[in-house]
Amino acid sequence: MRVLLVLDHPYTLASAENVPHRRSFTAAVAAAAVRGAAAAGHEVDVIDLAADGFSPVMTREDLVAWRRGAVVDPLVGDYQRRLLAADHLVFAFPVWWEAMPAATKGFLDRVLTKGVVFAERPGARGNPFRNLMPRLGGVTVLSVMTTPDKAYRWWYHDPLTKILFKGTFGKIGVRNLRWVNFDRVTGRTPEQRRRLLDATERRFAALAPGRGGDPARKGPLARRGPLTRSGT
């Protein structure tokens, strides 16, 4: 099975190592997911948005090219090819201002384009969108935040799942959507961090083949991930 992981953090995947002032717990979680999936024999492809220098801005040239069935930015075309080849998609990012960082939103805007990853059927009854990613069997979101999980769900009303699941992948017909949230990141101990990373690795080692697997059900953690380490 081919797993595509999209990491969005300015420090890049290199910050997975626990080096003061150059570390990111988001990157450490992403690296643990990669290790687990690879240990299970899955092919793992990593898109490191910051390392690639990906721009989240949809330009006028992008829109003109899209209307002509073309792509201006070769990086966008490369991401689209890799997405179409994926059986399971994983996003890993910190939560800023209660939402994903700009590069992840730009990935949705510029890469998940109509005519490439989904089609729209004018006049269709019900949902007019059709999934053009037949291999993609599931999406897992790994989010890291300082906000308490309960506050995020009940006070802010879960904006991440509304945007990514209900408003994006669910809308175009992708099933098996899973969210793993690591809250209160700055208040966790080194032992809690280690346990969290070990559990994340086991979760993705248990990723089941066929229709994109289901790491949230197969792994050792529940829907939320309460154990984290300092630094988003």
Where are the regions a protein language model picked out?
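Functional cleft and adjacent loop/helix regions within the main domain
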Residues: 69-83, 129, 147, 160, ...
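Short, glycine-/small-residue-rich phosphate/pyrophosphate-handling segment
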Residues: 119-170
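N-terminal beta1-alpha1-beta2 submodule of the flavodoxin-like/Rossmannoid cofactor-binding fold
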Residues: 1-116, 198-232
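Residues at the starts of beta-strands that form the adenosine-phosphate
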Residues: 2, 43, 137-139, 176
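Glycine-rich phosphate/pyrophosphate-binding loop and the adjoining helix
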Residues: 151-232
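A short, flexible beta-alpha/helix-coil linker loop
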Residues: 9-13, 145-150, 184-187
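Structured loop/turn residues at beta-strand edges in well-structured enzyme cores
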Residues: 84, 102, 134-137, 175
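Short, structured loop/turn "capping" segments at alpha-beta junctions
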Residues: 114-119, 174-177
